[in-house]
Swiss-Prot record:
One of its GO terms (molecular function) is structural constituent of ribosome. GO terms for biological process: translation. It comes from the Bacteria. Keywords: Ribonucleoprotein, Ribosomal protein, RNA-binding, rRNA-binding, tRNA-binding. Signal peptide: none annotated. Belongs to the universal ribosomal protein uL16 family. This is Large ribosomal subunit protein uL16. One of its GO terms (cellular component) is cytosolic large ribosomal subunit.
Length: 144
């Protein structure tokens, strides 16, 4: 399970999930990627489940990059506890994902295998996603 080694503060505000992703919107390491098309919190358990689904399908071939990291703690109060008396105890870790963010990248496998592996991974995630390919640098030109 992914989580930070140490944090300055144990509890954080929830924050807003407005707008598009600022960075990490292009396929940087691999050949194919899984891009979020809506905003959500993704827990460390969901990231791990998606990773396992991909690597199981690809057997031993290929390489996987996880481009998101759960660095935001979320809290929960125990069951049957009245409102008030402070914020709840830290329950787990989430990654804030906004539209356009590349969450996973794959290389070293064919496009069909990558497409199916990322489809299986997308079923483990609470966001709508799309399959993207790496844009070749200098592939198309507008000259002449």
């Amino acid at each position: 399970m992914l989580m930070p080694k140490r944090v300055k503060y144990r509890r954080q505000h929830r924050g807003k999930m407005r707008g598009q992703a600022k960075g990490g919107t292009t396929v940087a390491f691999g050949e194919y990627g899984l891009q979020a098309t809506e905003a959500s919190w993704i827990t460390s358990r969901q990231i791990e489940a998606a990773r396992i689904a991909m690597t199981r399908y690809m057997k031993r071939g290929g390489k996987v990059w996880i481009k998101i990291f759960p660095d935001k703690p979320y809290t929960a109060k125990p069951l049957e506890v009245r409102m008030g008396s402070g914020k709840g105890a830290p329950e787990g870790w989430v990654a804030v994902v906004k539209p356009g963010k590349i969450m996973f990248e794959i290389a070293g496998v064919s496009e069909e295998v990558a497409r199916e592996a990322l489809r299986l991974a997308s079923h483990k995630l609470p966001v709508k996603t799309k399959f993207v390919k790496r844009e070749e640098i200098g592939g198309e030109s507008n000259e002449g």
